[in-house]
């Protein structure tokens, strides 16, 4: 009943084909080194600064949806969102148009972006983001609009198609397109299409995000094996180091105005936040202290014994 797919792939339990897309991470998730963070973040800033002009070219019909310059915008925006929010990749690529908001409370400006948390089944959650990430999301709203419109047209065509031929695959595609039509991080895909039919619009997948991050790292001039899952842990470490008086260059660029608030106050500011992110920050606090103490101790036994 799953057409050309399978129960495991439809349910999201199957590994995607190809080692480069599979879940090959083993052991402890590495923290992105500070120099790599700086290189990648600065590169992303350059890409996003040039984005309005590139989008003007696209809107004028002089650039196609698959142009590398447009793909660089999407990749850079995904990295900035991930590293400044602490979202898991599935949550970041699930952000939809109009899902962010700002509010002032007791003289402090808060910016929130909502998405769906799948790992623990909590559902809708909100993440605290800096103002620069709001601007990136506004830019992505413009980036995604024509792709969303193309997907909406496909939805309408699928709904109006009365023929029984290939019905199962059409219904699966219709359900997926309806689910993804408001997402910001979209791509073009030939999956299931003939060359003559061209491409259709799809939501960026976890596998596609991994490829995007590796491409981003290479373009930024680093050989670090950058991966989406590293951003959440790196975000937690950046928060901890900031509060321990060791802010990185990147963190200083998007330092929250409410950084003097305690973690308890930050969590209490919005009950819809992802509590597990705060758990990871506390875990990194412990790791940081252990690393700090170990750095004080040399390799020589303190007793001086053999």
Per-region residue spans from a language model:
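Extended accessory and catalytic-adjacent subdomains in large enzymes
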Residues: 3-306
């Amino acid at each position: 009943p799953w057409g050309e797919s399978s129960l495991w792939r439809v349910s999201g339990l199957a590994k995607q084909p190809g080692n480069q897309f599979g879940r090959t991470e083993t052991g402890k998730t590495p923290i992105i080194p500070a120099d790599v963070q700086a290189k990648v973040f600065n590169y992303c800033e350059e890409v996003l600064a040039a984005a309005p002009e590139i989008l003007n070219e696209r809107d004028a019909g002089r650039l196609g949806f698959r142009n590398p310059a447009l793909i660089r915008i999407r990749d850079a925006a995904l990295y900035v969102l991930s590293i400044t929010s602490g979202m898991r990749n599935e949550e970041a690529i699930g952000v939809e148009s109009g899902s962010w908001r700002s509010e002032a409370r007791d003289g402090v400006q808060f910016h929130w972006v909502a998405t769906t948390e799948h790992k623990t089944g909590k559902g809708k959650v909100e993440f605290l983001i800096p103002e620069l990430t709001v601007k990136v999301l506004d830019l992505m709203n413009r980036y995604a609009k024509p792709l969303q419109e193309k997907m909406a047209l496909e939805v309408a065509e699928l709904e109006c198609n009365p023929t029984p031929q290939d019905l199962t695959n059409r219904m699966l595609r219709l359900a997926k397109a309806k689910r993804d039509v408001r997402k910001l991080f979209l791509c073009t895909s030939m999956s299931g299409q003939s060359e003559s039919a061209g491409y259709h619009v799809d939501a960026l997948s976890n596998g596609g995000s991994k490829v995007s991050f590796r491409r981003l790292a290479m373009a930024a001039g680093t050989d670090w094996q950058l991966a989406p899952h590293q951003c959440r842990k790196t975000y937690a470490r950046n928060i901890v180091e900031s509060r321990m008086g060791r802010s990185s260059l990147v963190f200083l660029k998007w330092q929250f105005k409410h950084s003097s608030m305690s973690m308890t106050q930050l969590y209490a500011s919005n009950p819809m936040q992802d509590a597990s992110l705060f758990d990871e920050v506390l875990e990194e606090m412990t790791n940081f202290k252990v690393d700090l103490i170990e750095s004080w101790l040399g390799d020589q036994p303190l007793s001086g014994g053999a």
